[in-house]
Structures are given as structure tokens and as C-alpha cells.
């Protein structure tokens, strides 16, 4: 791996921090074509591919680099990214199996966040409740885990009162969290406060949507259009 290849990878990472995602992806692709082997940057590129719904490309890249030497936290990130890909490609059970194996090896916030959300998506009510409760005990300031538990109560148990407790905790920690804003806007609408609902939805629109968001950009825009 040459000096220019490393420079392109570092430049790509810098572009991400400045919000230039297209520029970052272009530089990462050039660096990979030139033989980039730094796992940190390859994982970063896989995340960009996933966020742009290029799941097949991300999966292919992750399979390629899984044999590379890497730190344990990077390997965990690789498996989480891979599970996200196969989930979005229609292989929910495979994604769950991968993440459950990772959780058995060691507890981590990243796995709690991702597996907890997938349990909700899979309508695994008992597992979702137990796991997301455990996740919030593991880290009661993880806004994603709090949102996962809130969604468990809201979507699977139809307990909106209990759900709101955790949505409120999540939004207090991360004010711009897309899914939390989306669900809290529904409480505003039920209370007849359209202005508050609109404010939350418009704030959600400014966020960076992920394939692991329940609320898509289209869903948020449609809700705003109804107001």
C-alpha cells in the first residue's frame, strides 16, 4: 500500500467529518482499487456503502477483509456491518444468528444497539423486551438502546405510556435522534399539538438516515405533508 493510497484514505475520512460523503466514497474507492488494506478505513467505507443502500457491495467487501488481521473491536464492527447487510438483503435470521454469536463472546454497546433493534424488527417480543432491558442496564445513557426499548413497548407491546418514558430519556441524551423524534411527534399529534409535531419531524429530516432507522426520510416527509 503506497503513500498516496494512505493519503487518499485519510483524506476520505476527513471528508466524512466535513459532511462530504460523495467525495469520501470516491477517494475510498480509488484507495481500495490501489490496494488499501487498512481495516479501519475499509470498515468506514463499508458503513458508507450500507448507508447508501449498496448492500451487495458492502457485503462483498466485508467478506474480503474478514481474513485480515485486526483488533477485536474492529472485528466486532465487521460482523455488525455484515449482519446489517444480510438483514437488509432479506436474511433476518442470519443477521440475528451472527449478532447473537457476537453477544455470546462479549457484551458491547454496538451489538446491544444493533441486535436490540433487529429483535424489534423481527417481532421477537420476548427477546426484544429482555434484551433491550438488559442493554439499558448495561448502559443507561445509550440513546439507541433506550430508543430500542421504547420501540419494544410502543410497537410490540402497545404500551405507549411505558414507551414514552424511554423515548423521553433517549431524546434527553441525543436531541437529534431520528426515530425518537418520529415517535415523539406521534404523541404530540395525539395531544393535538401539530406545531410541536412538525418541529420534531423537521428536526428529524436534518439527520443522517440509516438503513437501521425505523423511520425513513420518505416516512418523515409524508407525516409533515399531512400537517
What are the roles of these predicted feature ranges?
Residues 13, 47, 84, 117, ...:
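Residue-level recognition of tetratricopeptide repeat
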Residues 16, 50, 87, 120, ...:
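Position-specific recognition of the canonical hydrophobic site in helix A of tetratricopeptide repeat
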Residues 36, 70-73, 106-107, 140, ...:
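Short coil turns that delineate tetratricopeptide repeat
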Residues 41, 75-78, 111-112, 145, ...:
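TPR alpha-solenoid repeat register
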Residues 67, 172-175, 186-212:
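TPR/TPR-like (Sel1-like) alpha-helical repeat modules
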Amino acid at each position: 500500500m503506497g503513500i498516496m493510497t494512505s493519503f487518499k484514505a485519510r483524506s476520505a475520512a476527513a471528508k466524512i467529518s466535513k459532511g462530504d460523503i460523495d467525495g469520501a466514497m470516491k477517494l475510498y474507492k480509488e484507495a481500495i482499487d490501489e490496494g488499501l488494506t487498512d481495516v479501519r478505513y475499509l470498515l468506514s467505507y463499508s458503513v458508507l456503502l450500507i448507508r447508501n443502500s449498496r448492500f451487495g457491495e458492502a457485503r462483498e467487501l466485508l467478506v474480503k477483509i474478514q481474513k485480515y488481521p485486526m483488533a477485536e473491536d474492529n472485528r466486532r464492527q465487521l460482523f455488525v456491518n455484515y449482519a446489517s447487510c444480510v438483514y437488509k438483503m432479506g436474511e433476518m435470521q442470519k443477521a440475528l444468528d451472527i449478532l447473537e454469536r457476537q453477544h455470546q463472546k462479549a457484551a458491547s454497546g454496538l451489538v446491544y444497539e444493533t441486535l436490540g433493534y433487529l429483535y424489534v424488527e423481527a417481532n421477537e417480543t420476548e427477546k426484544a423486551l429482555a434484551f433491550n432491558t438488559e442493554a439499558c442496564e448495561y448502559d443507561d445513557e445509550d440513546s439507541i438502546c433506550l430508543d430500542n426499548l421504547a420501540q419494544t413497548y410502543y410497537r410490540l407491546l402497545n404500551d405507549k405510556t411505558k414507551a414514552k418514558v424511554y423515548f423521553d430519556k433517549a431524546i434527553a441524551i441525543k436531541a437529534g435522534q431520528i426515530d425518537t423524534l418520529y415517535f415523539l411527534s406521534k404523541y404530540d399529534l395525539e395531544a393535538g399539538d401539530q406545531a410541536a409535531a412538525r418541529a420534531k419531524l423537521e428536526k428529524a429530516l436534518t439527520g443522517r438516515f440509516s438503513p437501521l432507522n425505523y423511520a425513513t426520510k420518505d416516512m418523515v416527509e409524508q407525516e409533515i405533508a399531512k400537517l
